[in-house]
Amino acid sequence: MAFCAPPAYLTHQQKVLRLYKRALRHLESWCIHRDKYRYFACLMRARFEEHKNEKDMMRATQLLREAEEEFWQNQHPQPYIFPDSPGGTSFERYECYKVPEWCLDYWHPSEKAMYPDYFSKREQWKKLRMESWDREVKQLQEETSPDGIMTEALPPARREGDLPPLWWHIVTRPRERPT
């Protein structure tokens, strides 16, 4: 499950990178021959590199807006979408066949013996989750005000020195920005 931040919360660099990737994908739809695509991709990269070190944020924002308008005018009417990507013909087609994690608890010991490394690690993770779950829930309750959650900001992932919760990607955010 991928998290997609709303455009208002993206940094300028993230917006530029996403525009560049979208532009390359649409260019790929326009240029079906690989050599022609590569030539125009290099030209596009040069256009982006030209303003890479722009210090004036007003100018950089204006350039980004102009580039997005140019992209909007020149985008492909029927861009190629990969089948497993959102909007593709096979997107989430096989979700119904994915087996939940708890089903592995009911495997026969002879089946588990075929994957000893995986199941030994899995047992360690389950034990760790059972030991840390109550502590993590207590921590979240302590950090939440009595009036309830006042903002949409997610609680921190852990206190210093604690192990990361196993469900952090669902309910928490990292305490510090990763480097």
From Swiss-Prot:
Gene Ontology CC annotations of this record:
mitochondrial inner membrane; mitochondrion; respiratory chain complex I
* Subunit-structure text: Mammalian complex I is composed of 45 different subunits.
N-acetylalanine occurs at A2
Q: What protein name applies here?
A: NADH dehydrogenase [ubiquinone] 1 beta subcomplex subunit 9
Which Pfam families does this one have? Complex1_LYR
Q: Which organism is it from?
A: Mus musculus
Which is a GO BP term held by this UniProt record? proton motive force-driven mitochondrial ATP synthesis
Any idea which UniProt keywords this protein has? Acetylation, Electron transport, Membrane, Mitochondrion, Mitochondrion inner membrane, Phosphoprotein, Respiratory chain, Transport
Protein's job: Accessory subunit of the mitochondrial membrane respiratory chain NADH dehydrogenase (Complex I), that is believed to be not involved in catalysis. Complex I functions in the transfer of electrons from NADH to the respiratory chain. The immediate electron acceptor for the enzyme is believed to be ubiquinone.
